[in-house]
Amino acid sequence: MFALGIYLWETIVFFSLAASQQAAARKAASPMPPSEFLDKLMGKVSGYDARIRPNFKGPPVNVTCNIFINSFGSIAETTMDYRVNIFLRQQWNDPRLAYSEYPDDSLDLDPSMLDSIWKPDLFFANEKGANFHEVTTDNKLLRISKNGNVLYSIRITLVLACPMDLKNFPMDVQTCIMQLESFGYTMNDLIFEWDEKGAVQVADGLTLPQFILKEEKDLRYCTKHYNTGKFTCIEARFHLERQMGYYLIQMYIPSLLIVILSWVSFWINMDAAPARVGLGITTVLTMTTQSSGSRASLPKVSYVKAIDIWMAVCLLFVFSALLEYAAVNFIARQHKELLRFQRRRRHLKEDEAGDGRFSFAAYGMGPACLQAKDGMAIKGNNNNAPTSTNPPEKTVEEMRKLFISRAKRIDTVSRVAFPLVFLIFNIFYWITYKIIRSEDIHKQ
């Protein structure tokens, strides 16, 4: 009886142990609930403190950065800035977030968990304005890997300062930078690095209205030294080549046509003063308006731009065409002035000859006659006085033709000289700005 009781007891204990082992095996096979796992990983019971950086009092945290450009545009010359929409991705290792209790290799967490972990204090050094995106939810991504690697991605729109050199405008190439810098951590605590696999990526089909974004990536390091210490800084440079299509249609071609229109006056008769003066004044005023319009969308800089030189030379040619007619008209009328001068000289000589005769006005007798004793009237006559004779009509006509011929010769020379000089200016202008200066910019 006693042996039977012992046998039953051993049987019960055996089955109890087997059941407990099976329960333990089932418990080990089923993963920990996510909420419990997260509380254990970064909750209050975990001892994780988001205020303390990884490797505290140890080596600096290396943060690898890369950006994906969604859109690039709104490049403003007046304010010298540009607008860009990007995905900013930062990746670093936090040993405190390494785990082995959960089977997944990585965890994609809700953006609200970002407040529970440590993050780099990255900011954009040349930022003038920025905003996050919250439609339809916060555009943020947080991913934690088993080895403690943290990926933090965020979508932001930035307005960044871009100092521009407009000397070659509108044939310029601008370099706009994006600087990523640590605000509070010195290089003893935090270091930014560009991702070697793809630091800067651009969306397919990205186009700009006035610029071409060069494909080559210019990535640099720009460590900053302040009174508070040495801070890590990385920068990306975007090389933007301006497209001339808009400016050719809106500025260069209209001003070129205005200059050519001013040359029409060289083929108009010099006697048609209203037509030539009206054409000259109209082209000058139009060119002035065109020149003012070219500067309306540009900042007030102290140096001369390429478009300023073009507009100034075009205005000079148009104004010179107006002055050319003034010179032609002046020379054509010189024969009348010369005849008027000769007429005044003859009158002056006649007056001088009259002053040499005797004047009997004091005796009550006229200067023309003298009463003799015998009653005969003696007419005053001075045989030595020069007699005035008008120049022959042929001489006047020849003089008129001479001056008109000179005036016409100026018009004839202007018909060739103005286009030729303007052509030479164009050759030098386009060679200088499209070839020579363009090569200098690419070398830099």
Curated annotation (Swiss-Prot):
Q: Which residues lie on this side of the membrane: Cytoplasmic?
A: 269-273, 327-412
GO MF terms here are: extracellularly glycine-gated chloride channel activity; extracellularly glycine-gated ion channel activity; glycine binding; ligand-gated monoatomic ion channel activity; transmembrane signaling receptor activity; transmitter-gated monoatomic ion channel activity; zinc ion binding
Write the record's keywords in alphabetical order, separated by commas. Answer: Cell membrane, Cell projection, Chloride, Chloride channel, Disulfide bond, Glycoprotein, Ion channel, Ion transport, Ligand-gated ion channel, Membrane, Metal-binding, Postsynaptic cell membrane, Receptor, Signal, Synapse, Transmembrane, Transmembrane helix, Transport, Zinc
Q: Which residues form the signal peptide?
A: 1-24
Q: Which organism is it from?
A: Danio rerio (Zebrafish)
Q: Which cysteines are joined by disulfide bonds?
A: C162-C176, C222-C233
| Superkingdom assignment | Eukaryota
- What's the protein here called? Glycine receptor subunit alphaZ1
- Residues annotated as binding Zn(2+) are E216, D218, H239
User: What is stated about domains?
Assistant: The channel pore is formed by pentameric assembly of the second transmembrane domain from all five subunits. Channel opening is effected by an outward rotation of the transmembrane domains that increases the diameter of the pore.
Binding residues annotated for glycine 1, in chain numbering? R89, S153
User: What gene does the UniProt entry assign to this protein?
Assistant: glra1
Q: What else is known?
A: Highly sensitive to activation by taurine despite the presence of Val in position 135. In mammals, Val-135 causes a drastic loss of taurine efficacy. The alpha subunit binds strychnine.
- Topological type in the membrane: Multi-pass membrane protein
GO biological process terms, alphabetically, are: cellular response to amino acid stimulus; cellular response to ethanol; cellular response to zinc ion; central nervous system development; chloride transmembrane transport; monoatomic ion transport; regulation of neuron differentiation; response to amino acid
InterPro entries documented for this protein: GABAA/Glycine_rcpt, Glycine_rcpt_A, Glycine_rcpt_A1, Neur_chan_lig-bd, Neur_chan_lig-bd_sf, Neur_channel, Neuro-gated_channel_TM_sf, Neuro_actylchol_rec
> Where in the cell?
Postsynaptic cell membrane; Synapse; Perikaryon; Cell projection, Dendrite
- Glycan-carrying positions: N62
Q: Which reactions are catalysed by this chain?
A: chloride(in) = chloride(out)
